[in-house]
């Protein structure tokens, strides 16, 4: 049995229900047709190393994301939802993606601030003059100082008192080293550091250590490494610029003309820019008319989720989830950000609901495949038409048969003939129909082949016309020659002229043809003579 090659694109298409659920968690929506089109046709043309079968390489995904989210005219706002969903599949891989991911070669570390232990006992100050037991230390040679290494210097701390030296045991014959310096700063809330087991100090110390005398045992090395602590993140805010609003309004159709395109644009803006409540109002004010804005707000208030996740009908919950006046949400807190997320989600649902037009199947039937349009692009336009002019989802299983019949009937003639000859059309899925149509589309002649064929057909038509004209001229010439020949033969068959006294029969002179003795004569019967008393019959 043969083996099937699994690619990132085919893997995501097989588990597309999980992909759609992942996108829903990111507050965006993705469609299977566009997912396949962007991966196999659009992103390879960005020249960042994206293969036609997709990839799980995070560096390539981030390069595509940079190109797609370009704020200039070369950006692709309609593709943002798809590339960030792809990125999330790699950053938080589901079980069916993990076997295909590359293991990172290096690990990243986070540098955090050190915290001084809280319960720190201050060492007593060292005596100014040594006692009698330590006088012998004055006559010994001092130990050499270690080489200065700036990497081993501790970070600066704001300590209320200068550092002090730890006491040295009288029995220790060595002088204190620079590593025995201890900071005396004591922050109010920090646990005491654990003590290390007795051991010899390392050759190259990386931690701040000090030597302390135990009560009943030898000296121990205690660590002064402070516990790590995290720092609160601060949310940065960038309002919309006037140029952004102008470009969005100028380079995109109006909501009444193409609601799907403008909805995709606003969806990408909500995802990438993370706008506040005021920014959302500014966006609606610029991109929508008054009537369109009222319809969007009305539909959005119908889709405010309740405690169970379903749309609620309670006015107080609707006003709380989708307020019409400026709320007092604190975006630095988790509840404030959650309220803003629910507001954006309801606003996006309102845009999609207001973009649906009255049911008009006649509009759907007018969507036909173009002369040079690919089957995948035609299928995408057809699905958009169903979403725009019908109330049902064309990708739902119960409506796929209707979409399939429309795709076959409204396709190009050569593709339509091929699809109509398939066995069991009702059992074929939409993707299977597109693949069969692609086979016919890819076998079409190129423009060069078409031009050569037209030239050849023109030459053949001219040859047939010349042959027909030559044949007609041949018939005319043949008729003329035949007539001339007939005229000449008629002249030769005329009787020769005779003189006035010459017989035309025997050519002798002295009599005419009627009196020619050599001419045979017919025996005439004598006319009957009637007698008296007989009647003629």
Swiss-Prot record:
Keywords: Capsid protein, Host cell membrane, Host cytoplasm, Host endosome, Host membrane, Host-virus interaction, Lipoprotein, Membrane, Metal-binding, Myristate, Phosphoprotein, RNA-binding, Viral budding, Viral budding via the host ESCRT complexes, Viral matrix protein, Viral nucleoprotein, Viral release from host cell, Virion, Zinc, Zinc-finger. The keyword Zinc-finger applies. Pfam families: Gag_MA, Gag_p30, zf-CCHC. It comes from Baboon endogenous virus (strain M7). The gene is gag. A motif (PTAP/PSAP motif) lies at residues 173-176. RNA-binding phosphoprotein p12 is phosphorylated on serine residues. Residues 143-165, 188-204 have a biased composition (Pro residues). Transmembrane segments: none annotated. InterPro entries: G_retro_matrix, G_retro_matrix_sf, Gag_P30, Retrov_capsid_N, Retroviral_Gag-Pol_poly, Retrovr_matrix, Znf_CCHC, Znf_CCHC_sf. A zinc finger (CCHC-type) spans 501-518. One of its GO terms (molecular function) is RNA binding. A motif (PPXY motif) lies at residues 154-157. GO terms for biological process: viral budding via host ESCRT complex. One of its GO terms (cellular component) is host cell late endosome membrane. Residues 137-221, 302-322, 443-471, 514-537 are annotated as: Disordered. A lipid is attached at residue 2 (N-myristoyl glycine). The record marks 145-146, 226-227, 477-478 as: Cleavage. Residues 443-465, 514-525 have a biased composition (Basic and acidic residues). PROSITE patterns: ZF_CCHC. This is Gag polyprotein. Signal peptide: none annotated.
